[in-house]
Swiss-Prot record:
Protein localization: Cell membrane
Annotated protein name in UniProt: UPF0391 membrane protein Rru_A0119
Membrane topology qualifier: Multi-pass membrane protein
Superkingdom in the source lineage: Bacteria
InterPro entries, per database record: DUF1328
UniProt keyword Cell membrane present: yes
Family, as annotated: Belongs to the UPF0391 family.
Keywords of this entry: Cell membrane, Membrane, Transmembrane, Transmembrane helix
GO CC annotation: plasma membrane
Length: 56
């Protein structure tokens, strides 16, 4: 349990450094682009799944 607490502490410190350092704005715009890319890939994957014929 202590290991997880230390891991989350390190992650929080790194996130704070990014947030207070001004890198968060650039990272947020990249994250938005990646979100929409993966959303499109999800929709394509679902369409392919439901239109695929069963090969039994």
């Amino acid at each position: 349990m202590l290991t997880w607490a230390l891991i989350f502490l390190v992650v929080a410190v790194v996130a704070a450094l990014f947030g207070f350092g001004g890198i968060a704005g650039a990272a947020a715009s990249i994250a938005q682009i990646l979100f929409f890319v993966f959303l499109v890939l999800l929709v394509i994957s679902l369409i392919m799944h439901f239109t695929r014929r069963s090969r039994l």
